[in-house]
């Protein structure tokens, strides 16, 4: 039996089902390259010592260590922060496990998407899509965040922007993200990410973080730390407008 388990965005968000599985399985693996995973919480409930897997273990080697455990007739769990099938997809592992004849159970966790909207007072019913703000690769900037926000602003829909993770595991800061967005505006010049564009910054959610509603021109000078997400609001209703003011700067 193979489990893919989400334990939420930070300490205290783990579910009863996740705890039950961690206390039953013989092999526990985890990855923390997609989000900050609370290893202390994982160890508190784990029956055995958890083994960390890098991106290459899961992608380049197709989860070889996991399948070695399963081939011995043991139960195995892969643990992630947040919800295991939203911000990152381990669908390839599920497909491979089923092709090999193993049963698979996905255990949902509190996702960053739901948690960020809960923290921000904004309606998730108006979420128009998700994009990622990435560092430039080879001097090339991804325009996907710009294009999606532009479309959603025209439709009165909110946009959730996830922030990049560097190859060395460092999470993009809100300041760096704001700088990327302002650079995109300088290139595209369609008024999407002007310095006075106000966004919601949800920083270090689940780790004693904070929520801020401020213009990009101020965020680019801030000292807020990652991991974080941005929500670009549009078409605020009266309830959203009043509530979001409590996070204003």
Swiss-Prot record:
- Pfam families, per database record: TP_methylase
Q: Which GO terms describe its biological process?
A: methylation; protein histidyl modification to diphthamide
Major enzyme class: transferase
Name the SUPFAM superfamilies on file: Tetrapyrrole methylase
Pathway involvement? Answer: Protein modification; peptidyl-diphthamide biosynthesis
- Catalysed reactions listed for this entry: 2-[(3S)-amino-3-carboxypropyl]-L-histidyl-[translation elongation factor 2] + 3 S-adenosyl-L-methionine = diphthine-[translation elongation factor 2] + 3 S-adenosyl-L-homocysteine + 3 H(+)
- Quaternary structure note: Homodimer.
Q: Which family does it belong to?
A: Belongs to the diphthine synthase family.
The name of this protein is Diphthine synthase
The organism is Pyrobaculum islandicum (strain DSM 4184 / JCM 9189 / GEO3)
